[in-house]
């Protein structure tokens, strides 16, 4: 997320550590006072600046992401036009707080798309970014293999969030880390992961039937959310597209299916770690690559040389699909 409003520490040109407050909130003068008041949320509405020339989001993003024939990414950390103090700092400063724009939540519709030809998803992406009255809200890609690993090894994450919400994840992870720390002192490693996997193995299936059916039929999956203003046009396009392209299909999600589809995408992201931690005898480690595609890339399915692929147990592909 891009912002020009941040509170961060840096080492300046003279080699001195300094705290920079560009939050637009009057928190005092000294570093100790600023950080203490921020942590305690000790400030009034009148101390928060709302009229400012500083941006709290990227006001060019909606335009840039629509340029589907451009030969550069629309979203990547090394973009020199989107480097500003804390934004894009890549760990070179210590960020304590940022201010970001918020947007009104609108009524929306979720579509689940599957295909055995990645060209289908490319064509859909290009149409949705250039022809709808408003940009899609979200588009998440999951490959069949990532779907499988996520369904099995992200199940506890899925069920925990569904029951307790994302707000409680940090507390749960902190508790798990403490238990793991105690167990490692007596040379027991990965026991909590094994127990969680064993428990979830006996629990009922958590994913909607139509998603599971698409998992069996299709290699490539796209979870699409659009606002109500764009829903009818989106559905009409998908109907017409798949009427002449037999390599894929789609369905309009119920509210529950849409919620579970995006929750599954969230769980997929951490499932590889669980797989590693429960297969330490076979898995040396994970190589995680975050790749920014050019907006005009049509051949985005990775082809790994056989001499490298033979050393890989699994290749898991997932990501944000519209912001190449």
Where are these regions (language model features)?
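FAD-binding subdomain of flavoenzyme oxidoreductases
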Residues: 1-119
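C-terminal substrate-recognition/cap domain of FAD-linked oxidoreductases
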Residues: 99-102, 112-324
């Amino acid at each position: 997320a891009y912002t020009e409003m941040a509170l961060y520490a840096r080492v300046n040109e003279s080699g001195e550590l300094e705290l920079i407050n560009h939050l637009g909130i009057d928190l005092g003068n000294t570093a100790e006072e600023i950080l203490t008041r921020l942590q305690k949320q000790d400030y009034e509405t009148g101390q928060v600046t709302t009229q400012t020339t500083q941006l709290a989001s990227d006001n060019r993003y909606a335009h840039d992401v629509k340029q589907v024939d451009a030969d550069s990414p629309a979203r990547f950390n090394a973009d020199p036009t989107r480097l500003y103090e804390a934004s894009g700092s890549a760990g070179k400063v210590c960020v304590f707080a940022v201010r970001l724009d918020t947007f009104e939540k609108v009524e929306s519709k979720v579509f689940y798309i599957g295909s055995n030809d990645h060209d289908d998803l490319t064509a859909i992406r290009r149409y949705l970014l250039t022809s709808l009255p408003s940009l899609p809200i979200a588009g998440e890609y999951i490959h069949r293999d990532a779907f499988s690993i996520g369904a099995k090894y992200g199940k506890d994450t899925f069920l925990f969030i569904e029951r307790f919400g994302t707000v409680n994840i940090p507390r749960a992870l902190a508790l798990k880390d403490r238990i793991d720390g105690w167990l490692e002192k007596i040379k027991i490693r990965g026991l909590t992961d094994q127990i969680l996997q064993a428990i979830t193995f006996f629990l009922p299936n958590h994913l909607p039937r139509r998603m599971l059916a698409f998992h069996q039929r299709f290699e490539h999956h796209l979870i699409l959310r659009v606002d109500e203003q764009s829903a009818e046009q989106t559905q009409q396009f998908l109907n017409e597209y798949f009427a002449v392209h037999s390599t894929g299909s789609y369905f309009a999600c119920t509210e529950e299916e849409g919620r579970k589809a995006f929750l599954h995408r969230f769980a997929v992201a951490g499932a590889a770690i669980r797989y590693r931690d429960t297969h330490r005898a076979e898995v040396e480690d994970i190589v995680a690559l975050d790749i920014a595609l050019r907006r005009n890339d049509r051949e985005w399915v990775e082809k790994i040389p056989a001499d490298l692929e033979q050393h890989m147990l699994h290749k898991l592909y997932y990501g944000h699909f519209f912001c190449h």
